[in-house]
């Protein structure tokens, strides 16, 4: 029998582990995702008073079987109007609720309950026929998904001044795949177009050398080896709302680690508009090309334009006398001097993502960073 871990942590460290097989050829790389995310969560509790510490230790020791039900607190929905006795449905924000699974309704450490989920659709949890909420819950109570997990490494404890710190790591035992398309696409690729993304670029270069290879038949062959250091960067995400945190989580599952590429703007002023355009659709725009040494070098580059909350991805089909032609019209109203960024086709350069969820006065703050690598096309 699984036992609920009912204690709200101060921080949650979440690790998502994917596994991608990558094969390199002279024309590019081929990637195969070998499994969905393995979800690992480390709960950190800073406890005072001592009575709560005693409850934590007793709860852990009494679970001899080691099977746990772990609430996913960072995807909890606040019930602004509470919940009533005998209700059979609960309206929640999008999260990993599963038909046949369970959800936790939580008002406080002495008032909570688990409910079974018959169906979950359009943000509504429906309880099985004959089931209902067993008591009233006040406004400000929380509802969150619950997943089965094990704790293979035990409970860690540290004693400080007027405080006891606990940590334990849950390994979720059910498969997790929350993939969804939350971004607009261009050329079949998701475009990261929100303003909570920061990228840092490291310039690449070309290295050439000649190797003498012994072919095993008594002679040496001259082999030319050419290595191109692809564009690399680091992306950092900080999500302050439930909606953006959920969209980010789905984005990671959609990418499946290193498997799926996406478009990432540099968010630099790579090009500056040389005229006002819009609001009517347009497919040509003048740019300030004074600092472009070789205009032909930008042909084929993907670009990103964002002005006043509107944004679009496109590419440069041609350039002539400072006027770039786009393959299809865009409708963004832009002004002289507005920046246009280049956009790189990248993939994550890791199969392991480390996310931090910190509890705040008004919810949860989530953040993580990951390296990205340009995908050769």
Regions found by a protein language model. Give the residues of each.
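Autoprocessing Asn-cyclization modules and mimics
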Residues: 48-133, 187-189, 194-198, 242-333, ...
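Intrinsic-disorder/low-complexity, polar/charged segments enriched in Ser/Thr/Lys/Arg/Asp/Glu/Gln
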Residues: 40-44, 87-89, 163-167, 230-234, ...
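Small/polar beta-strand repeat architecture
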Residues: 1-20, 95-96, 109-217, 222, ...
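Small/flexible residues
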Residues: 25, 159, 165, 234, ...
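Short secondary-structure "cap/edge" segments that initiate or terminate local elements
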Residues: 13-52, 171, 197-249
